[in-house]
Design a protein with these regions (language model features):
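Two-component/phosphorelay signaling modules centered on CheY-like receiver
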Residues: 38-57
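Alpha4 helix (beta4-alpha4-beta5 surface) of REC/receiver domains from two-component response regulators
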Residues: 45, 90, 104, 115-130, ...
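Receiver (REC) domain active-site loop signature in two-component systems and cognate sites
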Residues: 83
Length: 184
């Protein structure tokens, strides 16, 4: 399922702030939830199923989740940061750089209690699309879902090894000068 085409004629596409009363049809989405906490996995699963999502797959560790991504090709991934032996950050980097991942462009929401700016930047630099701080609510998760699928940012690959959503500020997208990132 193409996330972009499934959202073209929704209120959020016209600049409307998403709320759970908007009545989005999430039923065809396939979402992978990765968290080592059983209670958090079940909470997120319950919220997602409450939003009408029929296919929610859960994993308790990033190694297993990577294998699931390769076989499932989810429409969206929600992952915790602090997991062992592979962290959520390493999981995101592996997806973005993965040779056998069916869709390196899959939207990824990082779900974590780590909210320091350094951590947010680190997650962004790993290639996440959105950041959601714990504790979560149904409303906050819903807004991140809508934001993630509505996000029109292009994906970029840098010579420094980054692959993921364009990290430049959306306020600067109308920049008309010479792009310093352009290759000669």
């Amino acid at each position: 399922m193409s996330l972009e085409t499934s959202w073209e004629n929704t209120p959020a596409s016209a600049g409307h702030k998403a709320s759970m009363s908007d009545g989005y049809d999430f039923s065809a989405l396939r979402i992978l939830v990765v968290d080592d906490s059983f209670h958090m996995r079940e909470l997120v699963r319950t919220f997602l199923e409450g939003f009408g999502i029929k296919e929610v797959t859960v994993s308790s560790d990033a190694e297993e989740a990577y294998d699931i991504v390769v076989g499932m090709d989810p429409d969206l991934i929600i992952t915790d940061w602090n997991m062992a032996p592979v962290s959520g950050l390493e999981f995101v980097e592996r997806i973005r750089k993965g040779a056998n991942v069916p869709n390196r462009f899959v939207p990824i929401i990082m779900l974590t209690g780590y909210t320091e700016m350094k951590r947010v930047e680190e997650a962004r630099d790993a290639g996440i699309n959105s950041f959601l701080a714990k504790p979560i609510s149904a409303a906050s998760l819903y807004k991140r879902l809508v934001t993630s699928v509505q996000d029109k940012r292009q994906y970029v690959e840098s010579t420094g090894g980054y692959f993921g959503p364009d990290r430049r500020s959306p306020k600067r997208r109308d920049f008309r000068g010479k792009e310093r990132r352009d290759r000669e």
